[in-house]
Amino acid sequence: MALNLSQKQEVVAELADIAAKAHSLIAAEYAGTTVSQMTAMRKQARETGVFLKVVKNTLAARAVEGTDFAVAADKLVGPLLYAFSMEEPGAAGRLIKEFAKSNDKLQAKVVSIGGELFPAGHVDVLASLPTRDQALAMLARVLSEPAAMFARAVKAVGDKQGGGDEAAAPVAETAEA
């Protein structure tokens, strides 16, 4: 279906708004993917905060101008599916990687994050990035570890010097009346 000029401008404006807010971009070849596979991928994309869109490459190139993904504009060739991670940088990578396992026709061609363009093989690296909750848990562990080490050291010194709890037992006094 051919788009008129105003429709093309709407598509570019929508995609430019998404690209400005997105954390990462993966452009993947999807030729040969069935409708049911694409529907399942779109459903999971909505659940994981990934914006999926199939648009003409010239419109996509115009939309990413002035964003971190402008470095990918020259690589947008062929029929491509655009996956923008809106909530977590690795969400699009996990989505594409998961669906590529069951569909060999789906292949990442462009991977971009933070104004950098990476080879298509880096989709695995992007997919392995921790989620926000995982990153916060790792940070909490890193921050709590020094305190735990100090507590273990104090306990070890206490055990070595007098047996720990036994040294703190009160001595009974006899009362004279």
From Swiss-Prot:
The keyword rRNA-binding applies. Gene3D superfamilies: 3.30.70.1730. Forms part of the ribosomal stalk, playing a central role in the interaction of the ribosome with GTP-bound translation factors. It comes from Xanthomonas euvesicatoria pv. vesicatoria (strain 85-10) (Xanthomonas campestris pv. vesicatoria). Pfam families: Ribosomal_L10 (PF00466). This is Large ribosomal subunit protein uL10. SUPFAM superfamilies: Ribosomal protein L10-like. Keywords: Ribonucleoprotein, Ribosomal protein, RNA-binding, rRNA-binding. One of its GO terms (biological process) is translation. It comes from the Bacteria. Part of the ribosomal stalk of the 50S ribosomal subunit. The N-terminus interacts with L11 and the large rRNA to form the base of the stalk. The C-terminus forms an elongated spine to which L12 dimers bind in a sequential fashion forming a multimeric L10(L12)X complex. HAMAP family: Ribosomal_uL10 (MF_00362). InterPro entries: Ribosomal_uL10 (IPR001790), Ribosomal_uL10-like_sf (IPR043141), Ribosomal_uL10_bac (IPR022973), Ribosomal_uL10_bac_type (IPR047865). The keyword Cell inner membrane does not apply. Belongs to the universal ribosomal protein uL10 family. GO terms for cellular component: ribonucleoprotein complex; ribosome. GO terms for molecular function: large ribosomal subunit rRNA binding.
